[in-house]
């Protein structure tokens, strides 16, 4: 019997993970962001939040699952272990970067953008960064 069958740790992880991308979900993001901001405030440490959204050539209300997976993969491969990526609504991804000032956050997101631009199916990325 696996941990998932017993309601063990992997079962808990699936409750907070987006099935399509493997990123944490919006609920996990909301709780985690509050905690990380409080920690940054207490320790007077920098914290950055980046919001990412792929830009598609075709106007559509429906996000593309393949593009969403490509964005998620590029984000995860670029981030440090301490950083957190979460899928919000549709094709939007939020990234929490602890101990990261504005220039570090911009540099990190630029690395994600370049990785996506050089992928077999290039993706254009719209991004914004906010810092504490």
PLM regions: where:
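Regulatory sensory/coupling modules that transmit signals to nucleotide-handling catalytic cores
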Residues: 1-10, 111-114, 124, 131
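Short low-complexity stretches enriched in small and charged residues
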Residues: 2-9, 50, 81-84
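Conserved long alpha-helical elements within nucleotide-processing catalytic cores of c-di-GMP signaling
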Residues: 12, 17-51, 55-77, 86-90, ...
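Short catalytic/binding micro-motifs of nucleotide second-messenger systems
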Residues: 39, 77-84, 113-122
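A structure-centric signal for secondary-structure junctions around beta-strands
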Residues: 44-46, 82, 124
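A short glycine-enriched loop-to-beta-strand structural element that forms part of the catalytic core
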Residues: 48, 87-98, 121-132
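Hydrophobic, well-ordered secondary-structure segments
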Residues: 97-102, 116-117
């Amino acid at each position: 019997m696996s941990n998932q069958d017993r309601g063990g740790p992997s079962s808990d992880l699936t409750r907070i993970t987006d099935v399509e991308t493997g990123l944490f979900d919006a609920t996990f993001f909301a709780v985690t962001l509050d905690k990380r901001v409080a920690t940054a405030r207490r320790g007077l440490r920098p914290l950055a939040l980046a919001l990412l959204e792929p830009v598609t050539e075709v106007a559509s209300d429906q996000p593309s699952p393949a593009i969403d997976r490509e964005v998620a993969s590029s984000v995860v491969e670029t981030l440090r272990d301490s950083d957190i990526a979460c899928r919000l609504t549709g094709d939007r991804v939020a990234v929490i970067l602890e101990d990261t000032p504005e220039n570090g956050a911009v540099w990190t997101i630029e690395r994600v953008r370049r990785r996506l631009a050089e992928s077999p199916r290039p993706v254009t990325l719209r991004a914004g960064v906010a810092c504490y």
